[in-house]
Amino acid sequence: MKMRFLSALVIFGLSNAASAENLLDIYRQAQGKDPQLQQAKAQRDAAFEKINETDAANLPQINLGADANYLKTNQNDVKTAGSAGASIGLSQSLFRRSNWLNSDITAKQATQSDVNYNLEQQSLILRTANAYFAVLSAKDTLEYVKANQEALKRQLEETQQRYNVGMTAITDVHEAQAAYDLATADVITAENNLTNSYEGLRQLTGSEYKTLDVLDTQRFSPAALSDGSDVWMKRAEDGNLSLNLQRINKDIAKQQIDLAKTGHEPTVDLTASLGSTYTDYKNTGASYEDGTLNSANVGVQFNMPLYSGGAIDSRVKQAQFNFVAASESLEQTYRSVQADLYRGYNDVTAAIGSVNAYQQSVVSAESALTATRAGYEVGTRTIVDLLDATRNLYSAKQMLSAARYNFILKQLQLKQIAGTLQEQDLVDVNSGLAKG
């Protein structure tokens, strides 16, 4: 029994350990496990199911009824009597324009839910990429601060040795010690940030990850955008999902005006029924006959609203105001998309420049450190200069790492704004990763 329990624990542990180690695998896991996406999917399915409910108003409505009664009186001719009956009724709408408008509105609302689901899929692509590269960035940061700490440790030991033989002052030892202590604090912070960054991935899939594929920096090369910002804006006008949601919302608001106006229109319904009632007379003083009464009727019902206290006119005005609000919301969304698009385009362009600049910065920092160390050896540079040069090198490497990830994410964000973001974009990014 104990072995079975331990085996169950092992199986449970394995089921929560993720085998996927790259961006694409984690995204595909998240597709089936991310609560935010699953919620949007369920809402979409419910919206499409509601179409069946709305369309049912245009189909026949059939009802079955039954009753039983017992009567006791103090009349001389009838003391007691019992009856039982059953009926079936049918009604069919012949003309109710509101039913057809409701069907159209419900279909548009289902389309809205479908667009919203697609929007959440794009959001999941971005959230997965952000969480993934947040981990890689935290790993790089930890690597660089550890390397900086190790370099400062060697400098501290060297400075201590130089002090011991009288080649430097005690202040240099204190400077080196302070720099090393600060680097140690940076390592502690970086380790904690890395641990916390993994939680972003677990939030998406519910699984834990130990190792991830890393960016292949040897093959990484930020390419300039092939199209101008106006071309990207045209794509956004046609494909931005938030913009499409607002367009559908405006169409629905317009139909709501027509729906409100149907309150003034006539309705025509077909009605039909079949019924049968059996009556049993008991203890009667008169000659009442027991028997069954059958009935059948077919009719057409016409209804024309004449006055409802102004309620219908009020509903029409409300719908008209809501249409104005929907129109303004569409315009607001368009302006927001336009601003986001141009900002996003500029961000990608700037990110390319940043990567190139930080690459040169690393080269320059390496040369500066070499020159500063040589100057320190001959006494033309101080220990402070050497410590600063060391920090500058690893800071430049850290900034270059962040710039690379920023470029990737800014490209994905631009594609989302344009409405073109899809799984293939993650496939392309994933192809630039290598085993960590």
Question: Residue ranges of each PLM-predicted region?
Answer:
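Gram-negative bacterial Sec-dependent N-terminal signal peptides
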Residues: 1-19
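Amphipathic alpha-helical coiled-coil scaffold segments and their short linker/junction regions
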Residues: 24-32, 173, 207-281, 424-436
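Transmembrane beta-barrel architecture of outer-membrane proteins
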Residues: 25, 83-85, 130, 175, ...
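A glycine-/polar-enriched beta->alpha junction
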Residues: 28-38, 45-60, 88-105, 115-122, ...
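Amphipathic alpha-helical coiled-coil segments
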Residues: 39-54, 120, 124-144, 154, ...
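Small/polar, glycine/serine/threonine/aspartate-rich low-complexity segments that form flexible
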Residues: 65-94, 102, 215-226, 258, ...
